[in-house]
């Protein structure tokens, strides 16, 4: 069984032939060349991720702020616990995805991980915005 290897920051001896590119344990240069991708699904994933992008300031929460105090205690408790769990998940994902990327040797796939990391940070921000409902 092969051992997982972290990719180098730059490898001048890495493979430039896209046919030799591997998702894990490849001989990557670690240079981005998104015109030559081994994994073409990345383009569709990238477009979808960018189309789904939003920021918390775009969401009007004024009715949520009014509705929260009117929820029954059990629903407020459920809401608070779910929100805290989602903040936890976003935090773990934001911290963990770069560590996974250290082992991905197909740069186009690392693009996906970078975008997901960024969007998890935004999710964390939006979750924190929702904690103001409880104030």
Predicted features, each with a name:
Residues 1-61, 75, 109:
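Extreme N-terminal leader/anchor segments
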Residues 57-70, 94-95:
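Active-site-adjacent bridging/hinge elements
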């Amino acid at each position: 069984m092969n051992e997982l290897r972290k990719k180098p920051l730059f490898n001048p001896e890495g493979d430039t032939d896209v046919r030799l590119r591997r998702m894990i344990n490849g001989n990557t240069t670690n240079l981005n060349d998104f015109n030559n991708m081994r994994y073409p699904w990345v383009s569709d994933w990238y477009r979808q991720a960018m189309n789904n992008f939003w920021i918390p300031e775009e969401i009007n929460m004024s009715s949520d702020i009014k509705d929260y105090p009117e929820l029954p205690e059990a629903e407020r408790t459920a809401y608070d616990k779910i929100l805290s769990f989602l903040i936890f998940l976003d935090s773990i994902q934001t911290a963990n995805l770069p560590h996974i990327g250290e082992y991905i040797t197909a740069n186009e796939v690392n693009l996906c991980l970078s975008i997901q990391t960024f969007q998890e940070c935004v999710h964390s921000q939006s979750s924190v915005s929702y904690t103001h409902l409880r104030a």
